[in-house]
Amino acid sequence: MKVVNLTGRIKIGPSEVLHQEVLEPQFIYELEYYLLYYVAIEKVLLTEYKRLELITNENKEMIMKILDKVTKESINPDPTANMSDIAFAIERFVEQNLEGEVPAWHIDRSRNDFQSCAQIMFGREQLLQVIKEMRDLSNSVYKLAKKTVYLPMPGYTHYQAAQIITLGFYLAAVNEQILLVMEKLLGVYDEMNKCPLGAGAMAGGEFEWERNRMAMLLGFSEPRNHALIAVASRDWTLQISSELSNFGVFLSRFVTDLIQWGSSEYKFIDLPDQLSGISSAMPQKKNFPIFERIRGKTAHLHAFYSDFVLGQRNTAYSNLVETSKEAGTHVITMFETFKSTIRLLKTTVDNLSFNEKRMLDVCTEEFFGGFSLANKLTLSSGIPYRRAQVIAGQYILKMMETGFRPEHIDIGILKGIGLEHGLQIKLTSEQLKSAFDVTHNIENKKTIGSTNPNDIKILMDEQEKRYKDIEKQWDKREEYIKKSVSQI
């Protein structure tokens, strides 16, 4: 199997097993995901060859037209013709279609910066798609939060009823996390969007490539300022996967709450039939396996991050197939998994219905006002706060033992407990009643970021402004790419 005019170093092309197990799958992968970027890079290099007066304008235009004919159908992995390497395949395709030799075409160039550049262009495009999905999710969560600012529901700590909140308060927290991740990914994008092209194999080129212009034409903000970093680093895969993995932790917790709320014990939420499942044996059941799918998918995000870390760990800091290709095998799978997760979650958010009566019933069944009662005892009667906590707890226990609900207040029992502690309780019946009132427990919160609907409205107005700014920043970056590459 003789190699056709590609190297003088080896005489025989790739073996069948190497071709089938490694090179052909890699070629097909790059054909699917990188070809568009490879062609764009070739065109930018071509303009530089012309600027450097290494080729004529006539040759430049001829090669440009040939590059336009490079498609998924026009090149293929061939161990003898191109060593099953897509960069060589493009080179061979152009050479075979030239009307005459162009000796300086492809002078002073390497696959290393060529491949690194295409990979980053692919990665940033995928990241832009991720952000679009997250923007859609944010919009859905925001709209639902705004509609439910006044809808009371029980809040839990340690899986026990704790304080009354509103659904809008909870969902505003979800949206806050989404916005935070989109903001953090702006920094990741800006750091990764530095052009490796012109770095050569690892030490730079021997011609004065105009790297700033090459970077601009390919949609980068600037050239990567160190040739070794340009070809050795794949930090962008670690940074993106790290952020998505971390966000996956939060998503899993959010979905866990949804799973609990949808259980037969809670009965807080419901989904339409088209998003629900059934039991094959228990006809009374209506299941929500979509939540389990979403939560299960978040686990893969952590695995992808670990995979990229382990794929790069203990490798030499230089260009390596191990880090540039093998370690990134599942990059596209990570992006697709994340986008799928977000689309599924958005669909559930858009279709959730809430059992408002059930949520309110739980708010009135549990003694959520204990915290407020302790505060009132201290303020009205001068009782030291820790002792006020003890008295409030004893009052609640007594009421539970006698079978009373929170609204069935008994100021006599409370004052009797106070006397047992040698204290005079001056709290009125009206004040005691307010401590266990659902609306009072929501509206009496006064700190910034509390469940008070007024605070949540302020927060959501701020979130709307942040969202618009984030949207503007991402749109600006995407528009810059479109404008830049249109000049090629």
Regions found by a protein language model. Name each.
Residues D78, M134, S138-P152, M182, ...:
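Long, hydrophobic, amphipathic alpha-helical segments used as structural scaffolds
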